[in-house]
Amino acid sequence: MEKIGIFVDVQNIYYTTKDTFGRQFNYRALWKILSARGQIMTAVAYATDRNDESQRKFQTALRHIGFSIKLKPYIQRADGSAKGDWDVGITIDMLQSAADLDRMFLLSGDGDFDLLIQTIKIDHGVPVEVYGVPELTA
């Protein structure tokens, strides 16, 4: 049985799914599909912490499914822009996990991960499958 890892860019998946389909992404269905493909060794959801009750409920639901949650503070800048980017954290975790996995799944439409995916494939021989909203995936 393949050892698999799941890495989720929660903000990216939330907004692209909501904008395209008008609803939330079904993490329970994803877990069912991927757990049928192998043994899930690690599953991490990377999110921002806005200290919001609905977000805490969502994070609790993800934990019940089997995800561990990594939170980064949500920073609202004076100019109105926001910061809560997990690209570097996801990259580090995937690179550190690659030697222990047979297959990786990245949920994000962020094109910045292309070099990471190629590095994992070349240096570790581990295939990385990307899940994202096709119209909004770079």
Predicted stretch roles:
Residues 27-28, 87-92, 114:
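Short, well-ordered alpha-helical scaffold segments within catalytic/effector domains
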Residues 90-100:
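Acidic, metal-associated active-site segment
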Residues 99-138:
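Active-site histidine-anchored catalytic micro-motif
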Residues 1-86, 99, 127, 134-135:
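Domain-level signal for Mg2+-assisted phosphodiester chemistry and nucleotide/NA-binding surfaces
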